[in-house]
């Protein structure tokens, strides 16, 4: 894995030196992952309920909040999985058949936050990202969409969802990462994939 990442970075930096270096500054996943692992029993329960890998949930917790259930971002993303009440929170409420959106206190509750984060990952996988065949590519697409929206990702391939999914299915995981690094409008999108791999390796 480390050799593959090193080779990929050499190619990327040589061929696209003007692009943002998404591995700089380096991110040490050890402490955030250790803190996120304390919530693994809840992540396993939520993962089983929504068909989501608990390790993916744990990695997102490490990246998003460093395992802090009271974390609040400048954009008002809240809790362990940094859920925005008015967007992903509202989407989860709709999936559950509820009206409105989650409260701040609800999103600071570890069990509720992780459950909603897992539910949102399921919404992405079974909705806009449905049809992606390669499990690793799907994992990368999930975290990029979780952080920056599925629409922004799909539009880098095509304005038509079916065509976008078809183009994604022509790529392996490294090619998908290269596409995101070169074409996604958000510089943090490829960095999120980099952090995901760092977090998974630290578990």
Swiss-Prot record:
Residues bearing a lipid moiety (S-diacylglycerol cysteine): 16
Protein keywords: Cell outer membrane, Cell wall biogenesis/degradation, Lipoprotein, Lyase, Membrane, Palmitate, Signal
Source domain of life: Bacteria
A GO-annotated cellular component: cell outer membrane
EC number: 4.2.2.n2
Gene3D superfamilies from the UniProt entry: 1.10.530.10
Compartments where located: Cell outer membrane
Membrane disposition: Lipid-anchor
Signal peptide limits: 1-15
Main location: membrane
Catalysed reaction equations from the record: Endolytic cleavage of the (1->4)-beta-glycosidic linkage between N-acetylmuramic acid (MurNAc) and N-acetylglucosamine (GlcNAc) residues in peptidoglycan with concomitant formation of a 1,6-anhydrobond in the MurNAc residue
Pfam families (alphabetical): SLT
Coiled coil, from the record: none
Lipid linkage positions (N-palmitoyl cysteine): 16
GO biological process: cell wall macromolecule catabolic process; cell wall organization; peptidoglycan metabolic process
Family statement drawn from the similarity comment of this UniProt entry: Belongs to the transglycosylase Slt family.
Protein's recorded name: Endo-type membrane-bound lytic murein transglycosylase A
Organism: Escherichia coli O1:K1 / APEC
């Amino acid at each position: 894995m480390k050799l593959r990442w090193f080779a990929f970075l050499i190619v990327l930096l040589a061929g696209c030196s003007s692009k943002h270096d998404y591995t700089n500054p380096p991110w040490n996943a050890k402490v955030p992952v250790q803190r996120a692992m304390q919530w693994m029993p809840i992540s396993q329960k939520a993962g089983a309920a929504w068909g989501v890998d608990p390790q993916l949930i744990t990695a997102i917790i490490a990246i998003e909040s460093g395992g802090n259930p009271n974390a609040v971002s400048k954009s008002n993303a809240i809790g362990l999985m940094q859920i925005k009440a008015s967007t992903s929170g509202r989407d989860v409420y709709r999936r559950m058949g509820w009206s409105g959106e989650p409260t701040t206190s609800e999103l600071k509750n570890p069990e509720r936050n992780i459950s909603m984060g897992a539910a949102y990952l399921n919404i992405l996988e079974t909705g806009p990202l449905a049809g992606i065949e390669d499990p690793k590519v799907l994992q990368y697409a999930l975290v990029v969409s979780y952080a920056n929206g599925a629409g922004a990702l799909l539009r880098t391939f095509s304005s038509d969802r079916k065509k976008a999914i078809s183009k994604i299915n022509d790529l392996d995981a490294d090619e998908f990462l290269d596409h995101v690094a070169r074409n996604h409008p958000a510089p943090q999108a490829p960095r999120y994939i980099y952090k995901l791999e760092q977090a998974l390796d630290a578990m």
